[in-house]
Swiss-Prot record:
Pathway: Phospholipid metabolism; phosphatidylethanolamine biosynthesis; phosphatidylethanolamine from CDP-diacylglycerol: step 2/2. Belongs to the phosphatidylserine decarboxylase family. PSD-B subfamily. Prokaryotic type I sub-subfamily. The keyword DNA damage does not apply. It comes from Stenotrophomonas maltophilia (strain K279a). Catalyzes the formation of phosphatidylethanolamine (PtdEtn) from phosphatidylserine (PtdSer). Its EC number is 4.1.1.65. Coiled coil: none annotated. This is Phosphatidylserine decarboxylase proenzyme.
Length: 280
């Protein structure tokens, strides 16, 4: 085990994330301005794309971090059969779910059942596709719908808060199946679809457009919320959630319905709205 990986295990994840939350929501201008200036400078954040490009106009760091984009900054792929990329960021991995397993890095993998919280939830995705998108601190931090879907259920799976940066992904086995996460099940025109919002070190929260804040969740049991019959329908490319700091979203598709865009591969930089896959 490398020193970096050992430190990843040793860090007080919950304490650090709680502290990050307090700072992110602080309306003390000395705190918010210092954080905004530091992150903008260190990660070369492009505020020209923001609906509000003035960094001094944000009352808190969290407002800055979850900023909206100006109209037209991102557009959905023109092909109406394209599933679109759910976020800005970088492809961590993508491919076929083989023998129920999802590849993570360097020969490491985890099962779809571990990720989703049950064998039953994973069955529709056997031999299907997965795409893991990492959002760095410089990226736009709202997550959108790859395809039009009606929300059926969410599943909160408690867990750790390991970093999801490259060093941790390469060094911590089954990382995405161990971190706290929110699994969002949708019914679509081609069948079921899942978007998994993975929590991480320093992520102070995950919010959805239908329920508000979902993470942090202070229970230690898997929690399910049934949304059937509520008619929560989100269109392709519509916002569905946001991270209150950088993290990862994983999309699962059932077998035989789509093929990934050929230019995509591990480490590909991606933008919200570009083609993720095309329906067959």
């Amino acid at each position: 085990m490398s020193l970096t990986t050992a430190l990843t295990y040793a860090l007080p994840h919950r304490l650090l994330s709680s502290m990050a939350r307090s700072l992110a929501y602080s309306d003390d201008p000395r705190v918010s301005r210092w954080l905004i200036d530091t992150v903008t400078r260190k990660f070369n954040v492009n505020l020209d794309e923001a609906a509000n490009p003035d960094p001094r106009s944000y009352a808190t760091f969290n407002q800055f971090f979850t900023r909206a984009l100006k109209p037209g900054a991102r557009v959905a792929d023109a092909d109406p059969r394209s599933l679109v990329m759910p976020a800005d960021g970088r492809i961590s991995q993508l491919g076929k779910i083989e023998a129920g397993r999802i590849f993570q890095a360097k020969g490491q993998s985890f099962t779809a059942a571990e990720l989703l919280g049950s064998d039953e939830d994973a069955k529709p995705y056997n031999d299907g596709l997965y795409a893991t998108v990492y959002l760095s601190p410089r990226d736009y931090h709202r997550v959108h719908m790859p395809w039009t879907g009606t929300l059926r259920e969410t599943v909160h799976v408690p867990g750790r808060l390991f970093s999801v940066g490259p060093a941790a992904v390469n060094g911590v086995p089954r990382l995405f199946a161990r971190n706290e996460r929110l699994v969002c099940h949708f019914d679509t025109s081609f069948g079921p679809m899942v978007s998994v919002m993975v929590g991480a070190l320093l992520v102070s929260g995950v919010e959805t457009v239908w329920s508000g804040e979902e993470i942090p969740h202070y229970g230690d049991r898997i929690t399910r919320k049934d949304y059937r019959g509520q008619g929560i329908r989100l269109e392709r490319f519509a916002e569905m959630a946001r991270f209150n700091y950088g993290s990862t979203v994983i999309v699962l598709l059932p077998p035989g319905v789509a093929d990934f865009a050929p230019q995509l591969g591990a480490e590909s930089p991606v933008q919200l709205g570009q083609a993720l896959a095309k329906l067959r």
